[in-house]
Regions:
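Negatively charged
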Residues: 1-359
């Protein structure tokens, strides 16, 4: 019998319980075991997890045994990935995360989890939290008040499709080093409010789809956002159909190259002031205001479109727009104008006149 403890994962014989151990008893356990570092593919997915095409539907419970507290993992990435029927994880107090640097996809597609108590987590060394809670569709509450995010650089898709979350308190988040926030709240369709006033976004380069599908948000204060390094804002607010107003007067878009579908299906927006937008580097504007059906006016006379290649469906479905000033639009590089004004039935005044042929 080995006298050196090892970290391993044990699957019970009925295949319903996954237990994490750090002891010398692995050989004596019935059922299947894997070493904590065993992987199943070149992507680094742990050997006990499943893939998206064939998620695990037998494991109901995961347990961290008391012995596991003596182990010091440096990664917990993908540990519960695609355990679709996992209902509870017990013994979080027995996992020591003081040396963990990567928590990417840790709970990815754990769609049956309704609650997670991570108050014992030490995240002071974690650099990657991308996709961490993605597809946790049944989570109704998530307390991250103990999270130290000072070293995190990737929060992309962190809460993607957490469809049942009605509130999320991130007031303690330090985002000073974060570079990726794309899809961070994508599909959080039950969130009614979101306070990000403490967010430092000075290093963020990607906000693509950040709030897309947050269909219950009635307001969003982004006055503290520094967007001076952001290159992609495509789909950023797409599907935020309950937003009636959006103040982006502080947005620096001088580095932006993608604004496609940025406000797509923001059906309740009645006004949108983009007078401060610098679009001199933007290449994609397709679907930018798609079905913004409550907008009555939009002044884009200052838009520099000299690098834009795609304007297809840009104003499609803007049924309440009565006038649109595009007098400064340079369409020399545009190769796609298909459906640009489709469904703009109230649009009677369009400047310049050459655009009227697309009505």
């Amino acid at each position: 019998m080995t006298t050196t403890p090892e970290a391993y994962v044990h699957l019970s014989e009925d295949q319903e319980t996954l237990t994490f151990y750090y002891d010398t008893l692995r050989a004596e356990r019935d059922g299947t075991t894997w070493g904590i570092r065993d992987t199943k593919d070149d992507y680094g997915n742990p050997a006990w997890t499943a893939n998206s095409a064939s998620p695990n539907t037998t494991i109901l419970t995961a347990v961290f045994d008391a012995s596991f507290h003596d182990f010091r993992p440096t990664t917990t990435a993908r540990w519960f990935k695609n355990l679709q029927w996992l209902e509870s994880i017990k013994g979080f107090e027995h996992i020591n995360t003081t040396e963990v640097r990567d928590m990417k996809m840790m709970f990815f597609y754990c769609e049956s989890l309704t609650a997670l108590d991570l108050s014992s987590f030490d995240t002071s060394k974690v650099e990657n939290m991308g996709w961490m809670f993605s597809y946790c569709e049944s989570l109704t509450a998530l307390d991250l008040s103990s999270f130290d995010t000072a070293k995190v650089s990737d929060m992309s898709k962190m809460f993607r499709l957490c469809e049942s979350l009605t509130a999320l308190d991130l007031s303690n988040f330090d985002t000073a080093k974060v570079e990726k926030m794309d899809g961070m709240f994508f599909g959080c369709e039950s969130l009614t409010s979101l306070d990000l006033s403490n967010f430092d976004t000075a290093k963020v380069t990607d906000m693509n789809g950040m709030f897309a599908g947050c269909e219950s948000l009635t307001s969003l204060d982004l006055s503290s956002f520094d967007t001076s390094k952001v290159k992609s804002m495509g789909w950023m607010f797409a599907g935020c159909q309950s937003l009636t107003a959006l103040d982006l007067s502080n947005f620096d878009t001088s580095k932006g190259t993608y604004m496609h579908w940025m406000f797509g299906s923001c059906k309740s927006l009645t006004a949108l002031d983009l007078s401060n937008f610098d679009t001199s580097k933007v290449e994609m504007m397709d679907g930018m205001f798609f079905y913004c059906e409550s907008l009555t006016a939009l002044d884009l006379s200052h838009f520099d479109c000299s690098k834009v290649k795609d304007m297809s469906r840009m104003f499609e479905g803007c049924q309440s727009l009565t006038n649109l000033n595009l007098s400064n639009f340079d369409t020399v590089k545009v190769t796609n104008l298909w459906g640009m004004f489709k469904g703009c039935q109230s649009l009677t005044d369009l400047d310049p006149v050459e655009f009227r042929k697309f009505l």
